[in-house]
Amino acid sequence: ISSAINNATNRITGQSAWSPMGSSANIEGRMLAEELAGKSRKYPGVLGTGICKLPGLNCGRTGLGESAARNAGYDPVSVITVVDDKAHYYPGASSFIVKMIADKSSQKLLGLQCMGPGAVDKMIDIAVMAISLGADLSSMEYLDFAYAPPFSTAIHPFAHTLNVLLNKLNGDMDSFTPVEYKEGKAQGYTVLDVSINPTLEGKEYVNFTKIDGVLPNHPTDENILLVCAKGKRAYLTQNRLKYYGY
């Protein structure tokens, strides 16, 4: 048993997984010792959890990515969010970029990827626990996470991302993933800049707070792609436009 040579089992798929991690190697070492001492133990496998630190940036992941989930027979749905890692007014506050992946039919959490200068490990470890317990998204919707401005946001960044994914799965939000956009699924869509201030050169700017009906020169059957910095204003604009028949 060694972190250098470690061919384990992925606990989601049941398939062989290369996971040369010191953490799982130590767990396996403990289990081996217990087996040698006469206790029967069964190792459930790994999730491929990993984390690293770069200059000014922490990156972590656990579970299945979209491609791996699809190859394992799941129908994955994902969202990417940019969320505050603590109260925005607190010194040292920054952001997480989070990708959350779930199975479409069961809505079970399959994977999480997170990067940012803050406590990425906490985001990953929450996902590890959820995936290991077979949790679906709705069962985590109202978890009572620890909150104080130095540590988190009032709606935890994990819960925030989960809510966005639930909105997408339940049909309350329509969005493209970057991969879908690259594949051309937004071909023929009219791009509208809905940021706080105009940011996209050559694109029409729309302030959602000023929308009080059908947009001039944009019929309700037009395919429109709403773009902003973090997704929040695009979501609010989408809701406003749906109200007016789009």
Predicted regions and their residues:
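Mid-to-C-terminal Rossmann-like scaffold of FAD/NAD(P)H-dependent oxidoreductases
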Residues: A4-G118, T153, P157-G184, Y189
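Short phosphate-binding/catalytic loops that engage adenosine nucleotides
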Residues: Y74, A135, G245-Y246
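Conserved beta-strand scaffold positions in the cores of enzyme catalytic domains, especially
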Residues: P76-S78, V191, K203-F208
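A short, polar/charged loop-to-alpha-helix boundary motif
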Residues: P117-D136
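Generic hydrophobic alpha-helical segments
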Residues: A127-V128, Y181, I224
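Catalytic P-loop NTP-binding/switch module of NTPases
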Residues: L137-L143
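Short, polar loop motifs at secondary-structure junctions
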Residues: D193-T199
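Catalytic cysteine-centered active loop of the rhodanese-like fold, especially the PTP/DSP P-loop
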Residues: I211-Y246
